[in-house]
């Protein structure tokens, strides 16, 4: 079956957005890394520690997960996409933030906070 000129043009034009999209994603990753001013070693250490902390609470698929820097509208974000296999069965007590516990402490209860 012979390809028409239209088929050839359509085939060529379909590939262009895919490669342009890939190039754009790569450029955004490079820009995010540069703007964050984080070394590769520090970023790798952060990824490792984030995975360790999350793994304390849920079972995650480390091989399928990703922690990356993303830039959108001049804002850089650290994004963790971690598929959860299952949650842990034990109950976990979370600590209150230090400032919140001071506000709710028995010594300050019933007192006017402006005095």
UniProtKB/Swiss-Prot annotation:
Protein keywords: Cell cycle, Cell division
Region (Disordered): 89-115
Keyword Hydrolase applies: no
Cysteines paired by S-S bonds: none
Gene3D superfamilies for the chain: Cell division topological specificity factor MinE
GO annotation terms (biological process): cell division; regulation of division septum assembly
UniProt-recorded name of the protein: Cell division topological specificity factor
InterPro entries tied to this protein: MinE, MinE_sf
Family designation: Belongs to the MinE family.
Function of the molecule: Prevents the cell division inhibition by proteins MinC and MinD at internal division sites while permitting inhibition at polar sites. This ensures cell division at the proper site by restricting the formation of a division septum at the midpoint of the long axis of the cell.
Organism: Prochlorococcus marinus (strain NATL2A)
